[in-house]
Curated annotation (Swiss-Prot):
Its main location: cytoplasm. The UvrABC repair system catalyzes the recognition and processing of DNA lesions. UvrC both incises the 5' and 3' sides of the lesion. The N-terminal half is responsible for the 3' incision and the C-terminal half is responsible for the 5' incision. The gene is uvrC. It comes from Borrelia recurrentis (strain A1). InterPro entries: GIY-YIG_endonuc, GIY-YIG_endonuc_sf, GIY-YIG_UvrC_Cho, RuvA_2-like, UvrABC_protein_C, UvrC, UvrC_RNase_H_dom, UvrC_RNase_H_dom_sf. Belongs to the UvrC family. This is UvrABC system protein C. One of its GO terms (cellular component) is excinuclease repair complex. PANTHER family: UVRABC SYSTEM PROTEIN C, UVRC/OXIDOREDUCTASE. Residues 199-234 form the UVR domain. The keyword Methyltransferase does not apply. Pfam families: GIY-YIG, UvrC_RNaseH, UvrC_RNaseH_dom.
């Protein structure tokens, strides 16, 4: 079995033994095949059997990832499969590509509603029940309804009663106008049954079965038995399809100590069409997380906001509803309702959230194993420390340290260092890297603290060699693996190797390194910007200088050191101010520069 198939098989071992749908993806993230299963783990495992067809083997050779959506029943899985195939039209799906759909029961919105089977939804106020994947079951139940209840069978009015009236299967509404109340009661009973309340009808069938068996009419008894079975099967609530002309999202958040898993189940025209999964490491409490996520998710530029957003707990959403509606110029609702259908949908979302978390952790573990192999490490890079350097034209140089554990940020391990080895205006990333690596790992050694498994430097060969020389000086180069990742080319450099490693963009090991590198870069720039803003705010301490003019001083004149290189006339000319104000700025810069030297503060 090829390596990628071995990896997939390990992923499948985590799948639940419940019903649902699975989507098979190619390396370029294209959906190749969509299927459904009563038992997801067992069904997907079958694709790895030696007895599979030649075509299936070709499919599996191209599959790099499998995503699943769990459902509450096999019926729901089948319906969802149909909807997904229609939406994505995968290469290897053929039989379900037709747009025929599954039949439903329609109760028309006429004065005397008719009840019949249909595959087409008309938005005219009619009520729909289903869809039903077993057409035979549906036909048997419809036949039972038509014989049990006296409903209208014909479309046109007549002066005389129809044949069904004479058979006792119609009240005679085709020729009488005074039966509205009586007819409404018949319809309400039918709706009651189609909503799953079948105990009375089942009891009636049991009595009827005993009667025909007593008369030795075994053929009728068999048909009644089949009808009973069909009635039980179609009474199962089909929550995959909600028959209304709305777009609705159902939001659920599964919180753990280290990670929040957010699931959005998306319904279009009453059909579940997609799920969207997000992982979040924020420290928000649940109520605040719901509010923050909804705000960010639905106000993003390309997001199509549904008619309704269902949430899993009651919170005040008036402000975020108003915000979304105003920004998007729409009218959406954010609602919480404890209806039977909503509870079942949220249960499905819960199941998918928990499963997504398992899959996420599995993928992270797989990426860490992949990284170990690529970097030829002796042990797994469970703990990675990443470094980056930032400065303002050679001033205020800082280094950031971020820590990742098992591919996830570990905020307690974040640090920022002010670089002291560079003079103001000096730009030397290699020298800055040497300082921060020396300070960091000298401290860990002296305090006998645990070393990381891997160090990542944001940069190229030069920065890597600088960091590696410090590790050698500390005699820990054999204890810690180290690499560098160049920004534009995304090439991985290793010590003592001339050629860098170029990985595919979707390679999980590269993605781990990119996440660490980008976080270190973000952290360094944020802190550097903070220092930059502090300088700007300091200028406002000069009498007569407001925030706008302070911003201009920083932009035109630069840092305190830059100002010291100018005389008062040059300052006045550049800033277009009088000589008195120029003297104040010059004097303030001299004072601040002296304070910084005394405090050893950059």
């Amino acid at each position: 079995m090829r390596k990628h198939l071995n990896d997939l098989y390990k992923q499948i071992e985590k799948f639940p033994k419940t019903s649902g749908c699975y989507k098979m993806y190619s390396k370029d993230n294209k959906i190749l095949y969509i299927g459904k299963a009563k038992n997801l783990r067992s069904r997907v495992k079958n694709y790895f059997s030696k007895r599979t067809s030649h075509k299936t083997k070709i499919l599996m050779n191209n599959v790099t990832n499998i995503e699943i959506i769990t459902t509450n029943s096999e019926y729901e899985a089948l319906l969802l499969e149909c909807n997904l195939i229609k939406k994505y039209k995968p290469t290897y799906n053929i039989k379900l590509k037709d747009d025929k759909g599954y039949p439903m029961i329609r109760i028309t919105c006429e004065k005397y509603p008719r009840i019949f089977k249909t595959r087409k939804i008309i938005n005219d106020g009619s009520e729909y029940f289903g869809p039903y994947v077993n057409v035979k079951n549906l036909d048997l139940v419809l036949d039972l309804i038509n014989k049990t209840f006296k409903t209208k069978k014909c479309k046109k009015k007549s002066k005389n009663p129809c044949l069904y009236f004479h058979m006792g299967q119609c009240l005679g509404v085709c020729y009488r106008e005074d039966l509205e109340d009586e007819y409404r009661k018949e319809i309400e009973q039918i709706k009651h049954i189609l909503n799953g309340n079948i105990s009375k009808l089942l009891n009636d069938i049991e009595i009827k079965m005993k009667e025909v068996i007593m008369k030795e009419n075994f053929e009728a008894a068999i048909k009644l038995k089949e009808t009973k079975k069909s009635l039980i099967e179609i009474s199962q609530t089909q929550i995959i399809t909600k028959i209304d002309k709305l777009s609705e999202d159902y939001l659920y958040i599964h919180k753990t100590n280290s990670l929040n898993t957010i699931v959005i189940l998306k319904y279009k025209d009453g059909k579940l069409t997609e799920k969207d999964i997000h992982f979040d490491e924020s420290i928000y409490e649940e109520d605040e997380l719901i509010e923050k996520f909804i705000t960010q998710y639905y106000t993003s530029p390309n997001m199509i906001v549904p008619d309704k957003i269902h949430i899993f707990k009651k919170i005040d959403t008036s402000n975020i509803t108003k915000l979304i509606n105003e920004l998007k110029n729409i009218k959406t609702e954010i609602i919480y309702k404890e209806t039977k259908d909503n509870i079942k949908i949220i249960e499905m979302a819960t199941s998918n959230a928990k499963l997504a978390l398992i899959t996420y952790n599995h993928e992270k573990n797989k990426a860490i194993e992949n990284l170990k192999t690529i970097l030829e490490m002796k042990k797994l890079p469970k703990t990675i420390e990443g470094f980056d350097i930032a400065h303002i034209n050679g001033y205020k140089t800082v280094a950031s340290l971020v820590t990742f554990k098992m591919g996830k940020p570990f905020k307690d391990g974040y640090r920022v260092y002010k670089i002291n080895s560079l003079s103001n205006g000096e730009i030397d990333d290699c020298k800055a890297i040497k300082e921060v690596i020396s300070r960091r790992y000298s401290k860990l050694i002296n305090e006998q603290l645990k070393l990381p498994d891997l160090i990542l430097i944001d940069g190229g060969k030069g920065q890597l060699n600088s960091a590696y020389s410090i590790l050698k000086g500390l005699r820990i180069e054999e204890k810690i693996a180290i690499c560098a990742l160049a920004k534009k080319e995304e090439i991985i450099f290793l010590p003592n190797k001339n050629q860098g490693i170029k990985l595919q963009k979707r390679n999980s090991a590269l993605q781990v390194l990119q996440n660490v590198r980008d976080e270190a870069h973000r952290r360094a720039n944020n802190f550097n910007n903070k220092l930059h803003n502090n300088i700007k705010l300091n200028y406002t301490k000069i009498k007569g200088i407001g925030e706008q003019k302070a911003k201009k001083i920083l932009k035109v004149l630069g840092t305190y050191k830059d100002i010291l290189l100018l005389n008062e006339d040059e300052i006045a000319t550049k800033m277009k101010i009088n000589i008195t104000m120029a003297n104040k700025i010059k004097k303030f810069a001299e004072e601040q520069n002296l304070n910084n030297k005394q405090n050893n503060h950059i």
